[in-house]
């Protein structure tokens, strides 16, 4: 065995060669690297930001959002897009379902004039476009809606009734292998919206599964299960849904946390409603009977009045949000939604 100084010298030479060939920082000792706060894109619901543990969707990662139909999956993704744009970021939306509603997106705060939109014909085309956009290094967030609609070219060009076993799963596996490393280098958040299917003949456990094979389950750093749990009514009219999101996988913080918030029809996630819920939970807002108070000042009688007060007084809402995030110790990287961490230039 070589002497310790010789081994150290050999290692230093190897590291110098790697840095020269692949760029500075390609290999480093873990202790050398300063701890970097996770840069995030806020979701629009403080309850969900808290459940994620870092204050939003982590940048440079793959996110999967799945659930039943009309549960609020696209709404969650569009709010993240709006927040990324608000911080000066560039967003793209790959509309494989050909169902994006520009009016609704605008109501949620998305700058539709600046949003990059693609409506591809095949799954291969959709993922190739997504890959090229990510490799540009200019994007902050890209949404693929949805995995189930990424139909392989062979299936589109084939006859009805033809068997195409495993084609979509292989397509997703190849795309994610190519994209994951690039996402990390460019700091782009990739949100894949997915649908649910049921496995036949399952006797025990949940028969529900997501489309597109197992690759997305493995590559996703965060998986969100979105469910509609009740309807919100104004008299007899249904005006929105109460939504529950479970963080079923989380590589950046503790998983299995849940968040509940209101999605109002035509308006999206109620940010003020979410602030009230979490504020009461954390004893920052006081609830006495039907009255809500904050630091001795009355917000209103009933949740709707309190929500209206916060909407009309954004400075109070921002103050409550800041106190919640400080108390729970999350959201340190939320302010850097557009910039992300300092990353070395990468030649693709």
Curated annotation (Swiss-Prot):
Matching HAMAP family: RecA
Domain of life where this protein originates: Bacteria
GO molecular function, one term: damaged DNA binding
UniProtKB keywords: ATP-binding, Cytoplasm, DNA damage, DNA recombination, DNA repair, DNA-binding, Nucleotide-binding, SOS response
GO CC annotation, single: cytosol
Pfam families: RecA, RecA_C
Binding site for ATP: 67-74
Family per record: Belongs to the RecA family.
This protein's name: Protein RecA
Cited function: Can catalyze the hydrolysis of ATP in the presence of single-stranded DNA, the ATP-dependent uptake of single-stranded DNA by duplex DNA, and the ATP-dependent hybridization of homologous single-stranded DNAs. It interacts with LexA causing its activation and leading to its autocatalytic cleavage.
PROSITE patterns referenced in this protein's UniProt entry, alphabetically: RECA_1, RECA_2, RECA_3
Membrane-crossing residue ranges in chain numbering: none
BP GO annotations: DNA recombination; DNA repair; SOS response
Chain's gene name: recA
NCBIfam families: tigrfam_recA
Xref: SUPFAM superfamilies: P-loop containing nucleoside triphosphate hydrolases, RecA protein, C-terminal domain
